[in-house]
Amino acid sequence: MEDQRHRLSTAAMADFVADGFLRFDALIPEPLNQAALEEMKALAPGKLRRTLHGLGGRAGRLERGIEPQESPESLTPLAACYPAPSALGAMLRFPAVAGIIESLVGANPAFDHDFIHHIPAGAPRGQHLHVDAVLEPAGQAFDIQLFYFPTAVAPGGGGTRFVPGSHLRRARAEGIARYQHVVGEQHYSGPAGTLLVFHQGLWHAGQPNPSGEDRWMYKIRLNPREPQQRLWNTADLRELQNDPRDHSFAHPGSNTVAQRFRRMAPWQRGHEGRYEQMQRAALWRYLTGDSTFDVDFYLTRQRVREGALGEAQR
């Protein structure tokens, strides 16, 4: 029987679908954090130089970094990225991290790209809100992005800003740059070894770092190479899964996936929440393979109407 110990639960997957992210505080042990930090410092100049070169920037003026291993090429299977003795590779293969990855994008997803984000102490500038794509296509398949912090980040210390629940809005990359101070947005701070896992569509931004400590973060994007259907530990799926009759205006359930999907961020209140419920239900149908799943009857109502129309046209 396949080992499920490190895979996500159905409850955690439902939280990911609802919020667009998961957070795992102090997940990576300190010796590995220290080794990964040293490797990140060595790799950072080279990664920045290659990025500027690709963008047509002034790459030639950058000092060549120590690069014990080149960055993987896009579409490389994750299992082939950063082989031993790489500390970043050890972090990605750490059992709890591997289980998270497998639950969301499969056992051996494709490497998309990665980058080392270094915000020096006292850095005054941050980023605007953005999505890491030009325009998200239709369909439910998704990439994930891991944000790994090998050192502690104090409040106000340059932690990533992000908007929970924004991932299903299919926004243009820069189309949300004008939004500021969104109600319910979070500013990351936390202990060393913390991992944030984002849906590709989550709105986020780098922050200024007025603190006296440099902030380091490693980000990697992964593409699924298999259908993302029931890849997690489904031992609790039967207990939490609801049928389409779970309807808050009729007979709502209590400990169900639908109940989790009714939980809204502060900016999603009112009728906005209904839109979010429909998007979450559609994504959950993809992940579970259950084409009847629904929250508050919205998708089912459409199917019933379409069926009635089909009968009338016969």
Annotate the PLM regions.
Residues P85-A90, V183-G184, A205-Q207:
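Active-site rim elements
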Residues P29-E30, H117-I119, V134, V153-P155, ...:
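Short, solvent-exposed loop/turn segments at secondary-structure junctions
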Residues E185, A192, E213-M217:
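Active-site lining segments that contact anionic ligands and/or coordinate catalytic metals
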Residues G99, P124-S189, P227-L237:
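Catalytic core of non-heme Fe(II) oxygenases with the double-stranded beta-helix
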Residues D114-I116, L146-Y148, Y218-L222:
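A structural signal for short, well-ordered beta-strand segments
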Residues L202, Q207-R314:
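Non-heme Fe(II)/2-oxoglutarate
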Residues M1-A18, D25-L129, L135:
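Non-heme Fe(II)-dependent double-stranded beta-helix
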Residues G190-H204:
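Conserved metal-binding segment of the jelly-roll/cupin
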